[in-house]
């Protein structure tokens, strides 16, 4: 699971996530960003010990489909939650890898699905990747 440790809201709309809430790795942007940094055998172990369930009609419940998405996450550098955890919400997330390349933390930017167009997702992803570079530099990891 992931645990939300900080959250900032903007505007009157509220997402269901809140500080302290636990959510599954397999259907959240930050979860998928973290999973993409793990070796395949660890991913399989996590999957096997997870209570995988369909939270929305878009939730991934097939390990091979998740593996396929994680290949994209590694290639792009960011993960997308496309209404998999909460209907009407899309999320862009990037992991913060440690010195060994494995991530134990990540951050995300979420918005209402109609406003999170492919173009906006690309712009947000670019900003998030730039922020990750700055964070890693501040931590002395890059």
Regions of interest found by a model, annotated:
Residues 1-10, 123-142:
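Intrinsically disordered, low-complexity terminal regulatory regions
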Residues 17, 108-110, 136:
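Short linear Ser/Thr-Pro motifs
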Residues 5-10, 37, 49, 109-112:
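Generic beta-structure capping elements
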